[in-house]
């Protein structure tokens, strides 16, 4: 699945690292950065890892919250260190997951913690501006909340390509079910197409949870075969209906 997303991230990250001369001959600059956004569990992190696997580039993965440190100035210094490390080991890919934790739209900060987070964002903007296109370093960022990001980060020249990772369609759900159940011992009565055709909006992570829960139901009953009733229980326990709400005590 995700054929369009794979093609777009390949053009933005993989091809500039492996065939940079192609862009030079055409007379264009490859995208500097890529933003992956979409609901949780739709494969944003796995897509970035797949790109790193298909290139010989060094892969540096950082979670946005890791930049937020106890002492003043530590966060911006870590941002500089990450980009310096990438340049020293070029070609390299910097993957910043959950970037919304440090790159939300700026506002009048009233606390020291908020001001420090904004300094981290300023350093991130500065580092992405100072990129030399001849240095093969690409930046991939992922978030569930693209609507909260600072406009200065989203402008062309920093994050040139925005790739949406939506919930899987029917064909993609079928493929994910096939992958998740490939090693499972399923009964002949299990009809995966029934779960694929259901209208509930589920992510790839939900599908994996359904299959895991179905397997656990079989283990609980001390069976070696997963039955249709196991999948039904797994589906009901893993998929939330639109009206469902968690109870808070």
PLM regions and their residue ranges:
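C-terminal engagement/docking regions of AAA+ P-loop ATPases
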Residues: 3-4, 26, 191-212, 217-249
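Walker A/P-loop NTP-binding motif of AAA+ ATPase domains
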Residues: 1-198, 202, 214
């Amino acid at each position: 699945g995700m054929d369009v997303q794979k093609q777009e991230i390949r053009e933005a990250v993989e091809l500039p690292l492996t065939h940079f001369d192609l862009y030079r001959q055409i007379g264009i600059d490859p995208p500097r950065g890529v933003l992956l956004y979409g609901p949780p569990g739709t494969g944003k992190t796995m897509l970035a890892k797949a790109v790193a696997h298909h290139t010989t580039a060094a892969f540096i993965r950082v979670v946005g919250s890791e930049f937020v440190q106890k002492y003043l100035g530590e966060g911006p210094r870590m941002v500089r260190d990450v980009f310096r490390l990438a340049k020293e080991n070029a070609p390299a890919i910097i993957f910043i997951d959950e970037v919304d934790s440090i790159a939300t739209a700026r506002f009048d900060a009233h606390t020291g913690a908020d001001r420090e987070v904004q300094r981290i964002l300023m350093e991130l903007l500065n580092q992405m501006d100072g990129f030399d296109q001849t240095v093969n370093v690409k930046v991939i960022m992922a978030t569930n909340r693209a609507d909260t990001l600072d406009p200065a980060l989203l402008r062309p020249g920093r994050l040139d390509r925005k790739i949406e990772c939506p919930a899987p369609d029917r064909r993609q759900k079928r493929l994910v079910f096939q992958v998740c159940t490939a090693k499972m011992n399923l009964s002949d009565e299990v009809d995966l197409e029934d779960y694929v055709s259901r209208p509930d909006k589920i992510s790839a992570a939900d599908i994996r949870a359904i299959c895991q829960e179905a397997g656990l139901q079989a283990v609980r009953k001390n069976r070696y075969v997963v039955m249709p009733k196991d999948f039904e229980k797994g589906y009901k326990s893993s998929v939330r209906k639109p009206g469902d709400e968690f109870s808070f005590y």
